[in-house]
């Protein structure tokens, strides 16, 4: 009888632990998304102008490129660092509380990117997730990530279209992710499709030469020349 009672208590304890672990994973998923909804671009823009980033330029994008274009290099760098920091925090949560592997890192980063792209408090109209996606890619696979970032940068320099380079970066990482495992490959494919979706308005008008061009080299020279 005592042994039977002891076994029942053990089973109940295991069930409680499983339930707690499940709840922790759900909470971690929510935290990763919520971290993504902290838009550094909105904070920096409000501090500098007293207005929302939605009023910056024609796009109203709270990302680094738009902030740098209208407010300067330093504010743009601050936005970049803020977006990288929140993504790193989300990836750490993913690793320690969702799955202690590269998959956990990818899940955390992907959720943060979704939060950045679709923040609930901004009527789900956020950034394009370029900085967060690049952060995920580099930490997920430093060597392959570095290569994809360089290729993406060269693509922007050659084509002068940021939207093209933004899609190329995660696209290159898909084979590397599938090589690791199926789930990682599907997650990386999802990030690529998300990047394509967020950049589709610009991609769709490239042929008509109406898409916004980004001459990085000329832009930097111009910015530095005004200092």
State what each model feature region is.
Residues 68-71, 94-97, 115, 130-159, ...:
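Interfacial segments of multi-pass membrane proteins
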Residues 24-49:
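N-terminal signal-anchor transmembrane alpha helix
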Residues 43-74, 204-227:
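Cytosolic, membrane-interface loops and tails of multi-pass inner-membrane proteins
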Residues 79-93, 130-131, 145-150, 166-170, ...:
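Core segments of transmembrane alpha-helices
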Residues 75-81, 85-119, 152-153, 160:
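Nucleotide and nucleotide-moiety/phosphate-recognizing core
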Residues 21-29, 89-107, 138-144, 176-187:
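Helix-coil boundary and interhelical linker segments in multi-pass alpha-helical membrane proteins
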Residues 11-23:
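Short, Lys/Arg-enriched N-terminal segments with co-localized hydrophobic residues
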Residues 51-61, 120-134, 161-168:
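Short, non-helical or kinked segments that cap or interrupt transmembrane helices
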């Amino acid at each position: 009888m005592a042994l039977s009672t002891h076994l029942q208590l053990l089973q109940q304890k295991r069930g409680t632990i499983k339930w707690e672990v499940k709840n922790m994973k759900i909470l971690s998923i929510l935290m990763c998304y919520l971290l993504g909804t902290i838009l550094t671009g909105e904070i920096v823009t409000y501090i500098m102008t007293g207005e929302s980033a939605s009023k910056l330029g024609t796009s109203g994008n709270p990302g680094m490129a738009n902030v740098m274009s209208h407010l300067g290099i330093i504010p743009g760098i601050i936005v970049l660092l803020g977006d990288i920091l929140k993504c790193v925090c989300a990836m750490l949560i993913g690793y320690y509380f969702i799955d202690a592997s590269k998959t956990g890192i990818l899940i955390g980063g992907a959720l943060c990117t979704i939060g950045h792209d679709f923040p609930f408090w901004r009527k789900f109209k956020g950034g394009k997730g370029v900085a967060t996606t690049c952060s995920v890619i580099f930490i997920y696979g430093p060597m392959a990530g570095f290569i994809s970032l360089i290729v993406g940068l060269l693509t922007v320099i050659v084509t002068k279209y940021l939207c093209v380079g933004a899609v190329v970066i995660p696209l290159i990482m898909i084979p590397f992710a599938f090589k690791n495992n199926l789930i990682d490959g599907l997650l990386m494919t999802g990030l690529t499709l998300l990047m394509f979706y967020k950049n589709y308005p610009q991609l769709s008008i490239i042929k008509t030469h109406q898409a916004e061009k980004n001459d990085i080299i000329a832009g930097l020279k111009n910015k530095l020349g005004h200092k």
